[in-house]
């Protein structure tokens, strides 16, 4: 039996402002949908194209989930722990959608992850995972997760700028997205 690979990535770990977002994605097997447009979110030059691909992923992914941790959590537990927490939440959103008999593992973009426990088959088990540096360039599931996380965070920043125009005037937040 094959193992379902859940791609996970984050957006917002580096900025000085705002939430950290994570996404988890399972795409259909290659050849069943067009995966050619799915790439690392940082490689998109057009915001419009990025949003179009995000919509395509949401319509065509088998499973997907998005989660965030806010500034208060980041300040309380630190950005690294908040990132892992949002990754766990996004992964659990996907895992809850899976049939009980499906085996799965996580593919994490990056070099670190906090092991995650789930209740399965009447036991508490650690979820298998692999950290992959540059994973968003190597695996479509991770690239798709990077897109969902980035668009969700960008939408949050845009919403904040609409509600608080002074964030644009004082910090140019609409352009720099909190990266300083």
Model-flagged regions — what are they?
Residues 1-180:
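RNase H-like, Mg2+-dependent phosphodiesterase core
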């Amino acid at each position: 039996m094959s193992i379902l690979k859940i791609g996970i990535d984050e957006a917002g770990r580096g900025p000085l402002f705002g939430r950290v977002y994570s996404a988890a994605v399972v795409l259909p097997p290659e050849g069943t949908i067009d995966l050619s447009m799915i790439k690392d979110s940082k490689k998109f030059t057009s915001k419009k194209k990025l949003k179009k691909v995000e919509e395509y992923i949401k319509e065509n992914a088998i499973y997907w989930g998005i989660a965030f941790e806010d500034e208060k959590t980041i300040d309380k537990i630190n950005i690294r722990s908040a990132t892992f927490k949002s990754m766990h939440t996004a992964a659990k959103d996907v895992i809850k959608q899976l049939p009980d008999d499906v085996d799965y593992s996580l593919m994490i973009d990056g070099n670190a992850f906090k092991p995650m426990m789930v209740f399965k088959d009447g036991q508490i088990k650690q979820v298998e995972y692999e950290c992959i540096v540059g994973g968003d360039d190597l695996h479509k599931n991770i690239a798709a997760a990077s897109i969902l996380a980035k668009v969700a965070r960008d939408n949050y920043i845009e919403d904040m700028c609409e509600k608080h125009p002074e964030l644009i005037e004082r910090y140019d937040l609409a352009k720099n997205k909190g990266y300083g």
